[in-house]
Amino acid sequence: MSRRYDSRTTIFSPEGRLYQVEYAMEAIGHAGTCLGILANDGVLLAAERRNIHKLLDEVFFSEKIYKLNEDMACSVAGITSDANVLTNELRLIAQRYLLQYQEPIPCEQLVTALCDIKQAYTQFGGKRPFGVSLLYIGWDKHYGFQLYQSDPNGNYGGWKATCIGNNSAAAVSMLKQDYKEGEMTLKSALALAIKVLNKTMDVSKLSAEKVEIATLTRENGKTVIRVLKQKEVEQLIKKHEEEEAKAEREKKEKEQKEKDK
């Protein structure tokens, strides 16, 4: 049935659906997991890295996380070549604003500007939508730390914690369960990110080379964006495994005590 209505982006089906936009969303569902968590003292992005090759140079290579300006970074899920075009556009928009107004662009304004472009590509004839969802983290003087998500159709929203990519529904339900509003520090957010990735990634054992993590904090009145080194990620994974083992032991001991009763 859909074949008659999905050859062009601009044709509505009788149910009022745009199939090409839905297919773009489908591409994101097969991409590596990306999640963002907002804490009181910062905000983080954690992403699954699929393209791991021992000959890749880490200094120049970041598969999932991009710095946009001094106050913002983003993570992508979907077609990487589309993501490169959009991140370049984001950087241009941010620099134009800085040149024009002599102050950094507010986070939401940058997200809105890109979403206008994404939405236009769902209307133009002969063009396809961008097959990319983005998570944005940032800080501005108006609203402090912020986390946004945008989709191929041009929709966006502000979040406290969210996930895009493969197994995102399972990840979001875990975040909903474990996110403690008003109590989240960056340290506890990092632990939660590792816990969620460990449960949702399609690997038997989580390893540091398959995970990319970036944090955004404020120090001495300046925004600091850091991509964690592999050793730091290894330590986080090790700590998580120790806590899991401890919880498992306590559970077994509790069960044993109940049996003995």
UniProtKB/Swiss-Prot annotation:
The modification N6-acetyllysine is found at residues 127, 176. The modification Phosphoserine is found at residues 13, 75, 173. It is found in: Cytoplasm; Nucleus. The keyword Cytoplasm applies. Belongs to the peptidase T1A family. NCBIfam families: PRK03996.1. The 26S proteasome consists of a 20S proteasome core and two 19S regulatory subunits. The 20S proteasome core is a barrel-shaped complex made of 28 subunits that are arranged in four stacked rings. The two outer rings are each formed by seven alpha subunits, and the two inner rings are formed by seven beta subunits. The proteolytic activity is exerted by three beta-subunits PSMB5, PSMB6 and PSMB7. PANTHER family: PROTEASOME SUBUNIT ALPHA/BETA (PTHR11599). This is Proteasome subunit alpha type-4.
